[in-house]
Amino acid sequence: EDPGTMGPGNPAPSPDSDTPSDSSKGSDSNPALLLVGNAAPPVHKKDSVVWPAWVYCTRYSDRPSSGPRTRKLKKKKSEKEDKRPRTAFTAEQLQRLKAEFQANRYITEQRRQTLAQELSLNESQIKIWFQNKRAKIKKASGMKNGLALHLMAQGLYNHSTTTVQEKEESE
């Protein structure tokens, strides 16, 4: 099945419907009829809707994927498979991690190993702490990634979505 066309899993709007907004009215509005940013609506051909290829691109790839992603059902976890509880760092551990971060925002493998032994932590706990600290600073600063800004200017990167109906009501 062509990923650009709606198939059995993704029914096209009813034949008597001329616009995408007609099919988005009602309680069972079609989530496929979302517009990203100020993108043009899909092209209607006979009884199917052809979506532009970029709609099927994932956030990790600029190539179209095979279509809408599906989730696997979560299986019930046994007690052994439960998530590890959140690490509660001691005041001493936090003080050392913060001091290390002040010296260098990116920790080397050797330094991570040494610190893990000295603080009685796993290397992965230290690695994740550093990642989270960098992410927190980045989020707080409000700085945007240069590539993201460039793509947003071209209308290719905008994670906000509105339904067709909402867009018409706001005009």
UniProtKB/Swiss-Prot annotation:
GO molecular function: DNA-binding transcription factor activity, RNA polymerase II-specific; RNA polymerase II cis-regulatory region sequence-specific DNA binding
Annotated Pfam families: Engrail_1_C_sig, Homeodomain
Keyword DNA-binding among UniProt keywords: yes
Any one Gene Ontology cellular component term annotated for this protein: nucleus
Cell location: Nucleus
Alphabetical UniProt keywords: Developmental protein, DNA-binding, Homeobox, Nucleus
Record field: compositional bias (Low complexity): 15-29
InterPro entries documented for this protein: Engrailed_Homeobox_TFs, HD, HD_engrailed, HD_metazoa, Homeobox-engrailed_C-terminal, Homeobox-engrailed_CS, Homeobox_CS, Homeodomain-like_sf
DNA-binding region, residue intervals: 82-141
A biological process term (GO) from this entry: regulation of transcription by RNA polymerase II
Region (Disordered): 1-41, 60-86
Function: Required for proper formation of the apical ectodermal ridge and correct dorsal-ventral patterning in the limb.
Entry's family note: Belongs to the engrailed homeobox family.
Name used for this protein in its record: Homeobox protein engrailed-1-B
The organism of origin for this protein: Xenopus laevis
Gene that produces this protein: en1-b
